[in-house]
Amino acid sequence: MPRRAASPAASEHEIDILGSIFANDNDTEVKAKAKKRTGGHDEIDLDIDALLNGAEDGGDGDDEALIALQQAASFRKTTNLKGKTGKKSGGFQAMGLNPSLLQAITRKGFAVPTPIQRKSIPLILDRRDVVGMARTGSGKTAAFVIPMIERLRAHSARVGARALIMSPSRELALQTLKVVKEFGKGTDLKTVLLVGGDSLEDQFGFMTTNPDIIIATPGRFLHLKVEMSLDLSSIKYVVFDEADRLFEMGFATQLTEILHSLPPSRQTLLFSATLPRSLVEFARAGLQDPSLVRLDAETKISPDLESAFFSVKGAEKEGALLHILQDVIKMPTGTPEGFKEDKDEGSKKRKRGPDRPNAKEKPTEHSTIIFTATKFHVEYLTSILVQAGYAVSHAYGALDQTARKIQVEDFRRGKTNILVVTDVAARGIDIPVLANVINYDFCDQPKVFVHRVGRTARAGQKGWSYSLVSDIDAPYLLDLQLFLGRRLVVGQDTSAGANFASDVVLGALQRNSIETNVEWVEKVVQESHDIALMRSVVVKAQKQYLRTRVSASSQSAKRARELTASRAWSQPHLIFGINTDDTEALRVEMLAKISGFKPQETVFEIGHGGKGTISEAVEVMKQLRKRAPVRKSKTDKDADDEDEDVPVIKRAKSDESSDEDASFDEDDFVAVNDDSDEELEVTVSNNADSAKNASAWRDSEHFMTYTPRQSNVAEERGYGVNAGSNGANFLEAARDVAMDIANDEKSTSFGAPTRTTMRWDKKNAKYVSRAHDEDGSRGNTKMIRGESGVKIAASFKSGRFDRWRKDNRLGKLPGVGEAETGLPRGMGGGGFGGGGRRFNHKREDAPKEADKFRDDYHVRKKRVAEAKEKRIGKFRDGEGSKREIKNNDDIRKARKIKELKMRKNARPARKKKN
């Protein structure tokens, strides 16, 4: 019997009962379709075979089976409507985003939010001010773009921008614009880009199109704000992207002026890779009860990271670096084997090559990043490593942005194995998972070390960090050991078993390899004049760096003297295995004694040790030794210092014993406040007599200590003014993560522009400070006061916008809050989003006039004739032009020509007949 066609149902939720009547025609087909429809879903525990087989027992079984199948299919459709996927909650679907934005996120390839996105997006959607701090490349841009698009939704017909994103550089602004365009494809939001280097007239046109989102650099945006007298009262959403770089590049004045013009009801977000102290003060002033979001709060260093610290001499660091690359990492020379050049680099459709590594994969097996102190170290080490045959990329703060992008892209694609950078440059670079990190110049702060090694051992992968520690770096190593709370293993100490992942393992490198590499480096320096000049500059830069870096603690400095003087300091590192042969150790010890040998004789006494005649100079030196007292050595002075500290300790103990009856202890007070060492200054007297009578001047009844006796500090703190607010919590959290990074070019403070502070005054024939020019005290540069009171350049208000508006015949523009009007013809709607084209780089210039003395005279003459015929450039307003109104210059020129002709002809003009 042939199968009958199914009768149509009114909706997909209704059941076609005719199918159950003819279900026995092809029972196997029905079972196959049922299994296909329900395969792979566990939402309903349904035994389909049992239901279908129930048709043999009675007629009602088929109806129940098919009804159950239809209900299961309907249930699956309703559960998959949100987000168009059947994924579990916990991703972007659980954040309450609109469907068009979810589709854009899925189209972008984001499946699960990154940790910074998971923590910050809910806070931003709740209209909270956020200070986001995360590792580079963790998705900070999407963390503030997604909530911005969710909040703005669509283009507003009311005049006034609603979102402002400040970026430190043109390249970063372009990158942010690209992300905004990709996430806002399902909306009609208008976005404009305002960066330096573009035409001001074009940007005037962009701002008159009523954009919703402004992505700008501080300098150009402040220029447009002053020139156009922009009203920023409609701004609701402000983002400072890479805020640490904004302050480092000297935009503090511009940011202060812009921040003063924003409404107080705005939502302010501040995202940064690091958190300098100046940025903390800016956040306190510009943000309201901010929430600090950071990712390194639970663990300081990844547990999968293994570290090795090598004790080296300052003059042998280049050889030690080559020894690590050759023998420890075993890095091959030349271009990596797996790298292939992209054949279709010129194709616009190809955005990613097939050989480009994934973001969670290492570019190469031996990918290594080397951190140095200054940009001069970067250039010098790059030249040395290139001479050694390695594929090297480099980057530093003063490097051109395009060159930096090319260098980092080569490293990311696997074209090079090594990237030599400074802390300033590496902070804003998106670097994937690395295999190794080498600290060529040891960091002066433990937080900087954590920031450096945080680029490896990501996503559950193993990683190594290698650090070169010289004698002057030993105090900083001990500070790092205390900060990490790890055990210090020096030399061949195998008593408790060294663990490279949980201990600070210190030792020396293999002496033979270092000497070979040092000799090779000296040979390269002698043969290359350029490298020799670089080395001389590096020596000066190293002195300046050591002079300006943060000092280590005094206790670590005392411990470092003992550490460097010990025998274990020069013992081989445990990474090379346990050395049972003491020959190498004895050799190193002998060389150390020879290098530290200091003869007791002077130059006058050399060669006069025999029984012969003694010269007069020798007799004089003997008499001087008898008269002069024996000088104390450095170790004796240290011992005396330690002896002087003993009474102070006794005094502290006596103070503690006298306060034992108090209800609150001073140690508890310090623990509750948790102040940093820089904010507290303790002055202790070394007078032994006062230490003996420490308790004599205290009166137990009337003496007032700086710690409360009868009150609970925790309770008082709970009743404090800032109790219950997020301001105090932000300050406490920011105190732990605040970190200042040393400049890689000059020793200027963070936030100061990196340029010379003095200039030559020709009039007075002397050097004067540039600060006088910037604040307007000198008459060279005219300054005006902004709305916040700071002085800005008077050139910002030059009248160019008024002239542009007059040339384009624009009247009064609508104010903020008014309904937008249609744009004049030819404006094009300028901008980058939501309709409207951008007319850039299409200006047609007329060719130059033909020169009779040039070989191409006839060619030029022909091109000029064509330009006159086509009305191009300056020939646009010739005879027969639609624009017949002449300007003042044309009228003045025509009158002058007419007067000259009249003088030449010597006769009056011809009068018209009536």
Curated annotation (Swiss-Prot):
The residue ranges of the Helicase ATP-binding domain are 121-293
Q: Which GO terms describe its biological process?
A: rRNA processing
- Annotated stretches, region: Disordered: 333-364, 626-667, 746-786, 807-857, 872-891
Per the record, the domain of life is Eukaryota
Q: Where is this motif: Q motif?
A: 90-118
Where is this chain compositionally biased, Basic and acidic residues type?
338-347, 354-364, 758-777, 842-857
Q: Known EC number(s)?
A: 3.6.4.13
Q: Where is the Helicase C-terminal domain?
A: 341-502
Q: Name the positions where ATP binds.
A: 134-141
The Acidic residues compositionally biased stretches are 657-667
Chief location of this protein within or outside the cell: nucleus
Q: Which UniProt keywords apply?
A: ATP-binding, Helicase, Hydrolase, Nucleotide-binding, Nucleus, Ribosome biogenesis, RNA-binding, rRNA processing
Compartment(s) of residence: Nucleus, Nucleolus
Q: Which GO terms describe its cellular component?
A: cytosol; nucleolus
Q: Motif DEAD box residues? A: 241-244
Which molecular-function annotations from GO does this UniProt entry contain? ATP binding; ATP hydrolysis activity; RNA binding; RNA helicase activity
User: Per the record, what are the reactions this protein catalyses?
Assistant: ATP + H2O = ADP + phosphate + H(+)
Show the ranges annotated as biased composition (Gly residues): 825-837
- Which of the seven top EC classes does this enzyme belong to? hydrolase
PANTHER family recorded: ATP-DEPENDENT RNA HELICASE RHLE-RELATED (PTHR47959), RNA HELICASE (PTHR47959:SF8)
Anything noted about its domains? The Q motif is unique to and characteristic of the DEAD box family of RNA helicases and controls ATP binding and hydrolysis.
In its UniProt entry, what is this protein called? Answer: ATP-dependent RNA helicase DBP10
Organism of this sequence: Pyricularia oryzae (strain 70-15 / ATCC MYA-4617 / FGSC 8958) (Rice blast fungus)
The gene coding this protein: DBP10
